[in-house]
Amino acid sequence: MKIINIGVLAHVDAGKTTLTESLLYNSGAITELGSVDKGTTRTDNTLLERQRGITIQTGITSFQWENTKVNIIDTPGHMDFLAEVYRSLSVLDGAILLISAKDFVQAQTRILFHALRKMGIPTIFFINKIDQNGIDLSTVYQDIKEKLSAEIVIKQKVELYPNMCVTNFTESEQWDTVIEGNDDLLEKYMSGKSLEALELEQEESIRFQNCSLFPLYHGSAKSNIGIDNLIEVITNKFYSSTHRGPSELCGNVFKIEYTKKRQRLAYIRLYSGVLHLRDSVRVSEKEKIKVTEMYTSINGELCKIDRAYSGEIVILQNEFLKLNSVLGDTKLLPQRKKIENPHPLLQTTVEPSKPEQREMLLDALLEISDSDPLLRYYVDSTTHEIILSFLGKVQMEVISALLQEKYHVEIELKEPTVIYMERPLKNAEYTIHIEVPPNPFWASIGLSVSPLPLGSGMQYESSVSLGYLNQSFQNAVMEGIRYGCEQGLYGWNVTDCKICFKYGLYYSPVSTPADFRMLTPIVLEQAFRKAGTELLEPYLSFKVYAPQEYLSRAYNDAPKYCANIVNTQLKNNEVIIIGEIPARCIQDYRNDLTFFTNGLSVCLAELKGYQVTTGEPVCQTRRLNSRIDKVRYMFNKIT
């Protein structure tokens, strides 16, 4: 049986969950349509998703049509959940990008389409909600051509009378775009030679698989218009990116989920081989796991199975598998272009409304961060506060609601702040000698620090030979440096810095690696104090798409938000403004753009890197370490 995995992607409220229900219903996988409004859909399966009417976590279901099994990945539609989208993209054989006939191309549609093209995933456009009043499809087509791609092939026409339906175009009506994109076919056509349908179909298929051509279909998921035709298209146009024939096992973990009973489930896409119940499987070329329970989606329901074949999505109950773990032969994993996950830029302090629920909160955050690596947390050793870092405010609102719904923990959040970093201002060295007060450790250490260009990251080298200071002591120094770089003079992580271990001395047999591990961060801090540090803040590169008449306002307002305009372009009826902006200002700039363009602007942004801050220095409370802080205090007093 052929197995294909497709993604359903769209902006918020474009109807992707409703479309999934219609595909299941029309294929016979379910006997009754679920409703987003009533909270009875198969993929939006949490109360939070049903209440908000949006998809938050990747949902998986399936149907079978003739000799093809289709696994449907119903992905989130809000930019704060892009990490969930990106993880699911890597397992897809193709995608359906929904566009609401009422709302046209939205900001999120552009982001998702950019990701699909970058990863090389064949994509079909599906214009949904064509049965709503006042729909002008020609305007929708033009919007798609201007904002997504002009290389679309409109495969159907919409019949309004006697009943609304969609019918396939004849061959002559749909081949213009295919011919225009191939010089040989165009020359043949212009010379009056006849073109065979087979060669046109082959050209369309090649360009579709190469993501340079996008077939376009219509329908209404809610009214069940065009769904049968879409099922035929899905099963015939998409190909499975799996290894055929006998081969070693290869699979990739793309989702971690916890059940209500706290069972930990790992979702795996198989790319080759066969996975059997009770198999012992090597994970990421390291340890082995034993398959004790295995599930897959069959006609919209999770069912236990005893074997799974290449192309399938399986679910294992396992405590050790992590996101992106590879089962079996890592060499068989398809090499797809990667998209950088959004980087957490905000952090806040969270505490339970009821102090007695603190342990419950920490246990819940451990599970949530295991499923979503973009949510990170730690407990401040000084204040004992729980610090969360995350992507956006909507993500934080959802996590707050999730904690209340699933874990029964209400929380209170402080106003979020941007996550900063630090860099040394100049070269500096510092040495602390053994048996010289106030050094209580049986170790001598000398370190130098040097600033590096922005974006260089951390570099480390040792000029102390292993013959003079053995590996265990040197490893302890590196561990101490990693710890010391977690807090610069302002309390933020240090980056763009070269650290050199220049001098070390030990006394045998009393010196231990722990002496070097404890002394290193103290030496490093003193070196930073001599060098001084500057505060770095995250900068975003952005693109603003807006109607041409708003160019002057958008351009002139940029300096108010510390934005630097790099370039402006005119395309069709839009102006494109390209620039850089501090992360702390992006939300205010977006809100301003939305206000004065009456919601007609789109602002796309991604992390560019860290630059020297233009705002006031922001300090973060240092985390305490009872074993070294007294010594730190003594050295700070004498320097």
Curated annotation (Swiss-Prot):
GO terms for biological process: response to antibiotic; ribosome disassembly; translation. Keywords: Antibiotic resistance, GTP-binding, Nucleotide-binding, Protein biosynthesis. The keyword Hydrolase does not apply. GTP binds at residues 10-17, 74-78, 128-131. Pfam families: EF-G_D2 (PF22042), EFG_C (PF00679), EFG_III (PF14492), EFG_IV (PF03764), GTP_EFTU (PF00009). Residues 1-242 form the tr-type G domain. InterPro entries: EF-G-like_DII, EFG_II, EFG_III/V, EFG_V-like, G_TR_CS, P-loop_NTPase, Ribosomal_Su5_D2-typ_SF, Ribsml_uS5_D2-typ_fold_subgr. SMART domains: EFG_IV (SM00889). GO terms for molecular function: GTP binding; GTPase activity. NCBIfam families: small_GTP (TIGR00231), tet_protect (NF012153), tet_protect_M (NF012155), tet_protect_M_W (NF033148). Abolishes the inhibitory effect of tetracyclin on protein synthesis by a non-covalent modification of the ribosomes. This is Tetracycline resistance protein TetM.
